[in-house]
From Swiss-Prot:
GO terms for cellular component: acrosomal vesicle; intercellular bridge; mitotic spindle. This is Sperm equatorial segment protein 1. Residues 1-19 form the signal peptide. The gene is SPESP1. Residues 140-203 are annotated as: Disordered. The lineage of its organism: Eukaryota, Metazoa, Chordata, Craniata, Vertebrata. Involved in fertilization ability of sperm. It is found in: Cytoplasmic vesicle, Secretory vesicle, Acrosome. One of its GO terms (biological process) is sperm-egg recognition. Keywords: Cytoplasmic vesicle, Developmental protein, Glycoprotein, Signal.
Amino acid sequence: MKSLVLLVALLLWSSSVPAYPSITVSPDEEQNLNHYIQVLENLVLSVPPKEPGREKKSNSPKHVYSIASKGSKFKELITHGDTSTENDVLTNPISEETTTFPTGDFTPEIGMKKHMESTPFWSIKPNNVSIVLHAEEPYIEKEEPEPEPEPTARQTEAPRTLPVVTESSTSPYVTSYKSPVTTSDRSTGIEISTESEDVPQLSGETAIEKSKELTFGKHPESWNNDDILKKILDINSQVQQALLSDTSNPAYREDIEASKEHLKRSLALAAAAEHKLETMYKSQLLSPGQTSNKIDDIETVINMLCNSRSKLYEYLDIKYVPPEMREEAATVFNTLKNMCRSRRVTALLKVY
C-alpha cells in the first residue's frame, strides 16, 4: 500500500514540474531519485507472475498506463537530450559536468510459474489462508492444511499375569497357575475364585457339592483331605521353582509378592475347608453301621440341628426335599414321629 502511495506521489510531482529544455539536478535530488527508482524496481520485480488462465480482461481506463509508460515518465523527468543505450546522462548547463547513472529495465522478470490454487477474495473462509498481491488484482492463495495425525486408540494396560507353570509328572492333576485371583482347571474347565475368604456354611449349597467341584476330575468319594493338602504343597513347590530365576527382575517383583499373599490365603482356606469337611462328612456321610466316636457323633448331630433350627420346618416339608432323597427323608420323618410318640422320649424332653 505504501508503494502505491509513493508511486502516485511521484507521478503527480512529475506532472507539476514545468518542461524546460534543461533541468538542473542537485546531487541530493539525484541520490533520492535513484533510491526511489531502485525501490520501485524491487517492488515490481517482487510481484509474482499470475497464471495466464486466471487473468481477467478489463477495458477500464485504469489499465491504460502500463509499467513501461510509467517508467518513461520517470525517464523524461530525470533525462534530457540524447540518451545512451547504456547510461542516462544528466547535464548541468553551468558547469558542463555530466553525471551518469545506470537505468533499470522496468520489465519484470518472468520466473518459473508456481502452481497454486486461487479463490476469489469474497469466498474467504476463516481458515489458514494468505493474501498474495499481484500487479493488477489481489487473489487468495490457499495453503493446504497439514493432515492431522490420526488419533491413536487408548491402550489399556493389560493385567499382569504370572508365568504359566506347567504340570510335572509327579502331579497329574495340577495344570497351571495364572493369576493371584483365579486358578484354572484343564480337565473340567472350572475357575475357582479365592478372593472371598468365606468358608461354605451349612445353609444353602452344602460343602459336599463344593467338594465335588474341587476334585479336578477325580471321583469325590476317593478325594480326601490328604490329597488336597498334597495338591497345595505340589503347587507351592512348583511356584517356588518357577520363580527362582525371576526374583532379581524388578518387573516380576510385584507379581511374586501377590503370589505369596495368594498362597498364604490358599493355605488358610485349605485348613478351614479341611475342618469343615471333616464336620460335614461326620454329620451327613455317617452310616448306621459305621463305627465312630460317640462323643463326636453327638456333637456333630447337635451342632447340625442347632445351626439349622431356623429352617427345620422347611426340611421337614416333603415338597422341599429333592426327588432322589425323598426315600431317605421319609425314613427320617417316620423315625421322628415314632420318637415323639414314645413315652421315653417324652419323659426325656420334660427334663429339658
